[in-house]
Amino acid sequence: MSRQVVRSSKFRHVFGQPAKADQCYEDVRVSQTTWDSGFCAVNPKFMALICEASGGGAFLVLPLGKTGRVDKNVPLVCGHTAPVLDIAWCPHNDNVIASGSEDCTVMVWEIPDGGLVLPLREPVVTLEGHTKRVGIVAWHPTAQNVLLSAGCDNVILVWDVGTGAAVLTLGPDVHPDTIYSVDWSRDGALICTSCRDKRVRVIEPRKGTVVAEKERPHEGTRPVHAVFVSEGKILTTGFSRMSERQVALWDTKHLEEPLSLQELDTSSGVLLPFFDPDTNIVYLCGKGDSSIRYFEITSEAPFLHYLSMFSSKESQRGMGYMPKRGLEVNKCEIARFYKLHERKCEPIAMTVPRKSDLFQEDLYPPTAGPDPALTAEEWLSGRDAGPLLISLKDGYVPPKSRELRVNRGLDSARRRATPEPSSTLSSDTVSRLEEDVRNLNAIVQKLQERLDRLEETVQAK
């Protein structure tokens, strides 16, 4: 009888640990809109989630440590006139977040360090160029102020947020149908897209050229999602002809056959992939699922190795993924997800069991830091650069907020002027405004009491 050889991996025993009740965000109203995005975005400072709101689209932003029950009157980011479909934090400024909406606009917002004290209605800049709803927003990983948006008009626009102008356009000639997913390569030289026309494309956005294309990576009719992984490969999730969910790994230079194709189950939810380039682990989270599967990608066959699955009782309505610099390295945490329930956001820590409390260098290689490697102008001129790396050995402390400056130049004449955002007010100004509000409330209370006394006098006569 031959012995089965088990592949050695330091991630074989990774396990998921949900946060305790007091470390969750309770009593939040998660959006009911049907759309295949995560509906949640997190960074080392803030947690943001798309929520139900009357009279337009809104999302909630809370300081990361402000857990527990969320007040029903908590101020929201509420400048959109229709439901918000996607949100994304800027990788180079933890106070800046972009949102795409059914109102056909992209808005970029600046959140003060302590969070919002008043509703935020005016964005730093509104980016107008799509003719149908905007379902995807994605920041360039290494170039400052470069933002991509994809709309249901089958158009991808790349914006220079610093000027408020669209600098690149990929029109319906590239994607003739709805775009399901867009992902930047690690150095931002390429994008990978999946489309309703059943094709996955690798595109050089500055030239507008498709450098690789795969027709029907999965035989089913349900949406496909695609992300870049290590060494020029892409990973796709989709469905078989028999509606079984699948995950596949592809070499972009040889797309004829997948390097690996695995069937998972027969659930109907679209699988959202999250890839960690530091560990080469990809996590698969399905909306409507109650589990997170994770796989390790290696450079030798069979390339894609199933590790394990975290399961819970309640299904997820969305999922946020924390950047590596927001993790607790002293607890050997290699990933953290923010699972959206119907009325709650629950952090889930993915941990490698280790006996020592010392920094584990093999788990934490230098990771992408918060500083951009390029300006928007440098990237547009043809330069590419990988992320500027930082060590997490001594922990990571988020820097104080850096103001986002927008210089519209000649473009301002044809776009609506954007007033100074309330989020840039100083703490002294905010304190004065809060005091004014309290004084006004006191005056209103006194007037109400006076009115009540007058009514009693009139009734007595």
UniProtKB/Swiss-Prot annotation:
Signal peptide span: none
Region listing for Disordered, in residue ranges: 407-431
Residue ranges that the Swiss-Prot or TrEMBL entry lists as coiled coil: 425-461
First-listed, main subcellular location of the protein, grouped into a coarse class: cytoplasm
PROSITE patterns: WD_REPEATS_1, WD_REPEATS_2, WD_REPEATS_REGION
Residues found modified as Phosphoserine: S2, S412, S422
Family matches, as Pfam families: DUF1899 (PF08953), Trimer_CC (PF08954), WD40 (PF00400), WD40_4 (PF16300)
GO cellular component annotations of the record: actin cytoskeleton; actin filament; axon; cell leading edge; cell-cell junction; cortical actin cytoskeleton; cytoplasm; early endosome
Annotated Polar residues bias: 420-430
Residue stretches of biased makeup (Basic and acidic residues): 407-418
Record's subcellular location: Cytoplasm, Cytoskeleton; Cytoplasm, Cell cortex; Cytoplasmic vesicle, Phagosome membrane
Swiss-Prot/TrEMBL keywords: Acetylation, Actin-binding, Coiled coil, Cytoplasm, Cytoplasmic vesicle, Cytoskeleton, Membrane, Phosphoprotein, Repeat, Ubl conjugation, WD repeat
Domain of life: Eukaryota
InterPro entries in alphabetical order: Coronin, DUF1899, Trimer_CC, WD40/YVTN_repeat-like_dom_sf, WD40_repeat_CS, WD40_repeat_dom_sf, WD40_rpt
GO molecular function (one): phosphatidylinositol 3-kinase binding
Post-translational modifications reported in the UniProt record: phosphorylation at Ser-412 by PKC strongly down-regulates the association with actin. Polyubiquitinated by RNF128 with 'Lys-48'-linked chains, leading to proteasomal degradation.
PTM sites of type Phosphothreonine: T418
Residues modified as N-acetylserine: S2
GO BP annotations listed: actin cytoskeleton organization; actin filament organization; calcium ion transport; cell migration; cell-substrate adhesion; cellular response to interleukin-4; early endosome to recycling endosome transport; epithelial cell migration
SMART domains: DUF1899, DUF1900, WD40
WD repeats by residue range: 13-63, 73-110, 123-160, 164-204, 207-251, 258-296, 302-349
Assembly information from the UniProt record: Binds actin.
Protein's job: May be a crucial component of the cytoskeleton of highly motile cells, functioning both in the invagination of large pieces of plasma membrane, as well as in forming protrusions of the plasma membrane involved in cell locomotion.
PANTHER family recorded: CORONIN (PTHR10856), CORONIN-1A (PTHR10856:SF18)
Family: Belongs to the WD repeat coronin family.
Protein name as annotated: Coronin-1A
Gene from which the chain derives: Coro1a
